[in-house]
Amino acid sequence: MTAVAHYLTWLEAMHAEAARLRHQEVEPEHMLLGLLAQGGTAAAVLAAHGVTLARARAAVDDMTHADLARVGISLPDALRPEPISAEELTAKAGGEIPLSDTAAEFIDNKGTSLITSAQALQALISSSAVSLQSPVVRLLAHCGVDVEYLRTELSEIAADEEPARGRYRMTDEYCGYGLDRVLSQERFISASAAQLAALLKDPDRLTWWGIPRQQLVDVLPDGAVQRVEGRRRTAFLRWRLETAVDTRTTWSCTVVSGRRDGEVAFVKDLHLIEAPGGTRVRLVLAHRTWGRLGTLLYPIVWRGTRLGLENTLAGIARAAAEDS
């Protein structure tokens, strides 16, 4: 994931976590939850220490009630606000919760210089402002993490620690669809393979990760229709669920308009690999080069396609966080 993409998706995730818990400001603990919700190396490292997104959310709730009890306030269960559902979060998109002074200072001083999730996690627990009473350290300690060991571990991770972004390759694996190029990318997500399989195969939730909501035309029993506006013409794409098993979900996307009517534009093949505390999602994008000009230009434009893969995986991580 590029530095800009990491920073923006992290900001979005931390705001969503604060909103989900109905908190009035984004605090450092929401920044940690954001890293878990974002997926990637930091989430995988934390999962190896037993800290999943679900466990960290529960720990924030436990610590909040413990702090209230410490000053003599005890809320009955009936008065405790329920977390906001995924549907509510989607409906309320656009509203922004302000950063607390502590979070704003961290972002202003360090935010844009943290180009990977591991660097962001290291900064959260290694900042000169961190003490044994800091919210992030308290949260991790509450989850049973040896924070000193975690600091040492993170210091040994290289700056460019996210999974390598591979170059495209030729393939005949998807020749039955008429596709001749493949790109792949992998990302750790703090969710179970079963949860992700249910999410990824559901046509009603394609807009959570695959199709921009404003481009959705229709939802079908086995897929959806997408409208893509171009500078000269509008194209329609038919998404179809090809494979849906516990460890693999495959979607094909066929052009259903214009002179390319009936041609498969791409296949998104998602492999779910169980990992400690979550799932490694491997996204394989098989696609075509669209004629001689496409073949000539492809060595120049394929990096933009690769960026699309990274955005898709980030969208899946976000959707899983909202769905849990």
What residue ranges belong to the model's regions?
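Histone-fold recognition with a strong bias for associated Lys/Arg-rich disordered tails
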Residues: 1-190
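Hydrophobic pocket/interface hotspot
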Residues: 196-197, 206, 224, 283, ...
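Glycine-rich portal/gate segments that line the openings of hydrophobic small-molecule binding cavities
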Residues: 207-208, 217-263, 323
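Long, compositionally biased intrinsically disordered regions
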Residues: 228-237, 241, 266-270, 275, ...
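Beta-strand/loop substructures that line and gate deep hydrophobic ligand-binding cavities in soluble
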Residues: 257-307
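A conserved amphipathic terminal alpha-helix motif
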Residues: 297-324
